[in-house]
Amino acid sequence: ESSPSSQKQPILQWRDYAKPGDVLPVYLPVLFDVEARKQMALNVTPYENQFYLNLTGWREDSRAFTFEFNQRGHQRYVIGEVSAADGSIRHLVDEQTKTFIYYYNNYRYDLDDGKELLWISERDGWRHLYLIDGTSGQVKRQVTKGEWVLRQVDYVDETNRVVYFTASGFNKGEDPYNLHYCRINLDGTGFTDMTPENGNHRVTFSADRSYFTDVYSRPDLPPVSQLKRTSDVSVVAGLQRCDVSALQAEGWQMPEVF
C-alpha cells in the first residue's frame, strides 16, 4: 500500500494467488431430490478441466437447470441442461474450435423457456447469430450471415420474432469499425440496416420502441442527429447538426481519413 492513512511509509501487503502446479478449485453442478433427501448422481467428469463453470438458472417449469462450461484453454464452450427428473445432462451448445473462443463477449438468449435459444458463434469465420433447437441442440438456422461482424444484440422481440443488433463491416468502402443498428427476422429474412448513413451510429429508442434517435458521426463529419420511425426506418425529423465553423475559423482542421 503506497500511501496508507496510518503512517507515512508504505505498507507491504501479501497476496496469495494460484501458480502453475497448484491445486485449483473445481465447480460442478449438483442436484438433490428434496423429497427423497438424497443427492442424485450426475456425470460431471467432462467438466473438470475448467476455466469456469457457472450455473445459469432453472427453467420456469422446474424441469431442468442450465450451466455454462468454459474449458481451460478456451477451445470448448458448452451450454448444458440438467434434467431434474433423472439428472441426465445434454448439451444445448457445444462450441469447439482449434483456435480460440472469445468467451468474454458470448451471447445467449433463451426463447419460450428454452424451447429455442439464440447463440452467437464464429464457427463460419465471422461473428453471427444462430437459432438453436432447445430440444435437440441442433442448429435450426443461421440467422445472420455474410462477411461482416455482428457486434452486440440489443433487443429480441419474441412476439414478432425479430432481433435488433449492432453490426459493422458490411458496407464496402466504409470504415469497417463503424457501428450500424440493424434488425432481422429470426427466420433469417428481412435484414434491414436501420442506420444506413455513412458513419458510426448510436441510437436511443422511445419507451414503446416506435421511434428512435440516431446520432452518427465520422472523424471528418461532426455529429448529426435524426429522429426516425422504427416501422419503416423513415426520417421523421432532423434534430441537430453540430456546427464546427467557429473551430475552423480558429484554424482547426478535421482529421484526414485514410
Task: Report each predicted region and the residues it spans.
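Blade/loop signatures of beta-propeller domains
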Residues: 17, 25-34
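Short, conserved, GDST-rich strand-edge loop motifs in beta-rich repeat architectures
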Residues: 1-24, 70-74, 165-177
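Residue position within the beta-strands of beta-propeller blades
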Residues: 64-68, 116-120, 163-167, 212-215
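Non-catalytic accessory segments flanking enzyme active sites
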Residues: 1, 22-28, 39-43, 52-57, ...
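Residue-level signature of beta-propeller blades and closely related beta-rich strand-turn architectures
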Residues: 71, 123-124, 169, 218
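Short loop/turn segments that connect beta-strands within beta-propeller blades
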Residues: 34-37, 84-87, 134-136, 185-189, ...
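Repeat-blade elements of multi-bladed beta-propeller folds
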Residues: 109-114, 157-166
